[in-house]
């Protein structure tokens, strides 16, 4: 029952945050505002282009978008709800594209659901060029014995599903439905992972983030010199549906 869009069909007039709401950023090349001389955002045909660049003498720049500001004000939806994003990104050592949802604010317990978290490059230290991870994180949550609550995750091998192509070779649509009972992850409308909906995901509102991180908290080394320290991600659309 996902018939009502939570935001406008074309997104015109919508304002976005270029940093991780209520928390610090995590990219080795900093997430950068649209007002910066190193603005990473532009429109190419009908696509949003996120350009990661590191001109000589700079720390570099890249992009993140979220519909919630640093005070937590913005677009939130509650279960049952559905999120999807269609994008293409460059696979190279250090690239770290992701589409994910979050409901944790400040230092309170909450959930992070990574619909796609991909790491570029091949070989040791670059683990999933041909696939990606769908991962839940249950932050600051303890069970009845005081132990950290274990969160489910799965590596998705894209070369065995659907069109059998990687996130770096063609556009794919990555979706997530958070229901009252189950949380389901999709690749091009094909279910690829499912787990029970955690308490915080089922009871508290969520917002999405899309980003093109370069190195940073991932721990993967950056090696983009062969590409003149430049790399791009193209986003076709992001859709958010609020169920009834």
Language-model features: where?
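GH16 jelly-roll
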Residues: 1-244
């Amino acid at each position: 029952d996902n018939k009502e869009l939570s935001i406008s069909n074309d997104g015109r007039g919508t304002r976005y945050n270029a940093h991780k709401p209520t928390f610090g950023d995590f990219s080795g090349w900093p997430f950068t505002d649209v007002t910066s001389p190193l603005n990473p955002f532009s429109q190419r045909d009908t696509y949003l282009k996120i350009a990661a660049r590191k001109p000589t003498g700079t720390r570099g720049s890249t992009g993140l978008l979220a519909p919630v500001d640093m005070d937590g004000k913005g677009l939130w939806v509650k279960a049952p709800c559905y999120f999807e994003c269609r994008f293409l990104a460059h696979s190279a050592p250090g690239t770290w594209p992701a589409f994910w949802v979050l409901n944790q604010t400040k230092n309170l317990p909450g959930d992070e659901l990574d619909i796609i978290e991909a790491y570029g490059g091949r070989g040791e230290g670059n683990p999933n060029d041909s696939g990606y991870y769908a991962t839940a994180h249950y932050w600051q949550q303890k069970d009845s014995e005081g132990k950290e609550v274990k969160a489910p995750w799965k590596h998705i091998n894209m070369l065995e599903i659907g069109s059998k192509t990687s996130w770096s070779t063609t556009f794919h649509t990555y979706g997530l439905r958070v229901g009252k009972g189950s949380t389901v992850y999709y690749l091009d409308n094909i279910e690829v992972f499912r787990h029970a909906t955690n308490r915080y995901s089922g009871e508290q509102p969520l917002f999405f983030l899309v980003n093109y991180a370069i190195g940073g908290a991932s721990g993967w080394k950056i090696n983009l010199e062969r590409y003149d320290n430049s790399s791009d991600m193209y986003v076709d659309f992001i859709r958010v549906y609020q169920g009834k």
